[in-house]
A protein has these predicted regions:
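Terminal hydrophobic membrane-targeting helix
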Residues: 2-95, 113-121, 125-131, 172, ...
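Small-residue helix/turn framework positions
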Residues: 43-52, 80-125, 138-149, 157-158, ...
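Extracytoplasmic/ectodomain regions of membrane proteins and secreted proteins
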Residues: 132-137
Length: 244
């Protein structure tokens, strides 16, 4: 993206006022803001790095934020946001869960709160298109998530989950998936989700294992055969699936 711009602090209070008007739960502190012209879009945007932003007492580690607005609004010292692009780094899932507790009840919310006990968004970028009332029209996101522990059931805990993701309104691409369950290691995997008339999901996982007597006893606690015999198996498996 080719840009030109100037640096100022004149819009700080205006931006903070607009943010708090939309949601008073935000606490925002800004350093100097750069007004830039995106030559590709012929559109102005306001840019700042490492702003101090808290929501419901949770610090959101935003590294950069860009707010696109109409040229005539800027000239009149007003802001009408139509696009927001921001990046985050090192955002712990505990902080994300605290924010999620404030949203409306849902099965997805309950699952995130009860089944994930660790993890981190290493880095992610979000591109949000909004209307003049700040209602979300379109979005894109990409990033890297790591060190997630996911509780599937009381006896099934998948650890050290990591993956890259790309998401928009029509697709979700998850790749470079790695994870471990006891002594079974998922070394690479991918999931593609396409939203058409119906959801279409395709995926594949490669798992590696080297199971000895102790590992079999952990995996098959109720099967006497593995307790009574010494067994060792090693190898790899490729799993592919498709859902429509």
């Amino acid at each position: 993206m080719s840009t030109v711009g100037i640096e100022t602090s004149k819009f700080n209070n205006l931006i903070i006022k607009e943010i708090k008007k939309k949601d008073p739960s935000f606490e925002v502190k800004l350093e100097k803001i750069k007004i830039k012209l995106d030559l590709g879009k012929i559109q102005l945007f306001l840019s700042t790095k490492n702003p101090s932003i808290q929501y419901q007492d949770v610090k959101i580690p935003i590294t950069e934020i860009r707010i696109y607005t109409k040229i005539n609004k800027i000239l009149n010292k007003e802001i009408e946001v139509n696009q927001i692009i921001f990046s985050v780094q090192k955002f712990k899932t505990q902080g994300l869960q605290k924010i999620i507790t404030r949203i409306k009840p849902s099965n997805f919310k309950t699952y995130l709160l009860n089944n994930i006990n660790r993890g981190e968004i290493e880095k992610a970028s979000f591109d949000l298109i909004v209307d003049k009332n700040f209602k979300l029209i379109d979005y894109k996101a990409n990033g890297v998530i790591s060190k997630v522990n996911l509780k599937i059931s009381n006896n099934l805990l998948i650890e050290e989950i990591g993956f890259n993701f790309i998401v928009d309104k029509n697709i979700a691409l998850i790749n470079s998936i790695n994870a471990s369950y006891k002594d079974i290691i998922v070394s690479s995997g991918s999931i593609d989700l396409h939203r058409k008339k119906n959801f279409e999901i395709k995926g594949k996982f490669e798992s590696k294992f080297n199971l000895k007597e102790a590992q079999f006893n952990k995996l098959f606690t109720k099967i006497e055969f593995f307790k009574e015999n010494k067994i060792q198996i090693q190898g790899s498996l490729l799993h592919e699936f498709s859902l429509k």
